[in-house]
Regions:
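N-terminal small-domain helix-loop-helix segment of the aminotransferase-like
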Residues: 2-93, 100
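Conserved PLP cofactor-binding pocket of PLP-dependent enzymes
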Residues: 16, 302-311, 325-345
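PLP-dependent aminotransferase class I/II
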Residues: 69, 217-301
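Active-site pre-lysine segment of PLP-dependent enzymes
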Residues: 127, 145-154, 167-190, 194-225
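Conserved PLP-binding catalytic core of the aspartate aminotransferase-like
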Residues: 283, 287-325
């Protein structure tokens, strides 16, 4: 078929992202029940009660199109973060913000630099727009910022940094981040993925929002999927200088964030009690897992997120054996950690 033949090679060679198996599929496949999903870094406490109530109260409005500007959520988040409303953009998960940035700022043949063992979607999206990825290995399970800076070439337009990193749960700290910024051209667009930033307890964690200036192109990505427990609604956001946001808005679909997601996110922002319960549960769960892994003499990477990377030997085999027992974890062979699995703190 000529239509297929005309598709660019960079599209035909894409390997689709494989999400973790849903509980229903595992139980159907193995004939089991009461499975536990520890694969996708979801909040085990679920959504905020206020978010659920907000959605229930407005279900009769589902015949109406959503607010394409996310006005009320934009105003609330602007106030909470202390940023101008015009510097915010919302997406169908923060994944969509990554895609919008790539479509806006990358041309075919342009390069993007990222860590080799970071969220695989970065490389997939870069390839999907005809860009090229330069992947730099982690050092001690975290971003090697000097090596990332050294990987920049004349074709580099964009760099991805995840802090904390997925799947390792590690962070880079303020001093090394500031040294890194001093090494990097301000013309390189930095996309800083902070999907798990709320879980960080290290006082030296650098909040990238504090480094936004008109001279430095930074997009900070955050999400309602993790701490706020709204993964099924798909809603995330980006913060960047208004000039960048204005360009990204031109390629955004007009109604990309559905109405229930906006209602729930707005209510979740106002539920400090649920946030505290979620963070407390994560802290206790992390301490428990680290203690048990130590008792079992299993090496693990100290985590600043809501998951932990643990070395189990044959990662894929352990994943399959746990799957048959109704425990779903995430194998990390695709991240070049064949001896590990990633376990959500549940």
């Amino acid at each position: 078929m000529k239509t297929v033949e005309q598709v660019p090679e960079y599209i035909r060679s894409l390997i689709p992202y494989e999400p973790g198996k849903p509980i229903e599929e595992v139980e159907r496949e193995y004939g089991i029940s009461n499975s536990v999903k520890l694969a996708s870094n979801e909040n085990p406490l679920g959504p905020s009660p206020k978010a659920l109530a907000a959605m229930r109260s407005k279900l009769e409005q589902l015949n109406l199109y959503p607010d394409g500007d996310c006005f009320y959520l934009r105003q609330a988040l602007s106030k909470k973060l202390g940023v101008a409303a015009e510097t915010l953009i919302f997406g169908n998960g923060s994944n969509e913000i990554i895609e919008l940035a790539a479509r806006t700022f990358l041309r075919p043949g342009d390069e993007a630099v990222m860590a080799e063992q970071a969220f695989v979607v970065y490389q997939l999206i870069v390839q999907a727009v005809g860009g090229r990825s330069r992947a730099v290995p982690l050092k001690n399970f975290t971003h090697d910022l000097p090596a990332l800076a050294a990987a920049v070439s004349t074709r580099t337009r964009m760099m991805f940094l995840a802090n904390p990193n997925n799947p390792t749960g590690t962070i880079f700290r303020r001093a090394e981040w500031e040294r890194f910024l001093g090494q990097l051209s301000p013309d390189i667009l930095l996309i800083v993925d902070e999907a798990y930033f709320e879980y960080v307890r290290d006082a030296d964690y650098p909040d990238s929002l504090r480094y936004h200036t008109h001279e430095r192109a930074i997009i900070t990505l955050r999400t309602f999927s993790k701490l706020y427990g709204l993964a099924g609604l798909r809603i995330g956001y980006g913060v960047a200088p208004q000039e960048l946001i204005s360009l990204m808005q031109r390629v955004r679909q007009p109604f990309n964030v559905n109405a229930p997601a906006q209602w729930a996110a707005l209510a979740a922002l106002d539920d400090a009690e649920h946030v505290k319960r979620s963070l407390d549960a994560n802290r206790r769960g992390l301490e428990f897992l680290q203690k048990e892994f130590t008792r079992l003499r299993l090496e693990f990477v100290p985590s600043q997120a809501n998951f932990i990377l643990v070395r189990v030997g044959r990662g894929q085999e352990v994943f399959q054996r746990l799957l048959k027992q109704g425990v779903i974890v995430r194998p990390t062979t695709g991240y070049r950690f064949p001896e590990h699995v990633r376990v959500t703190i549940g």
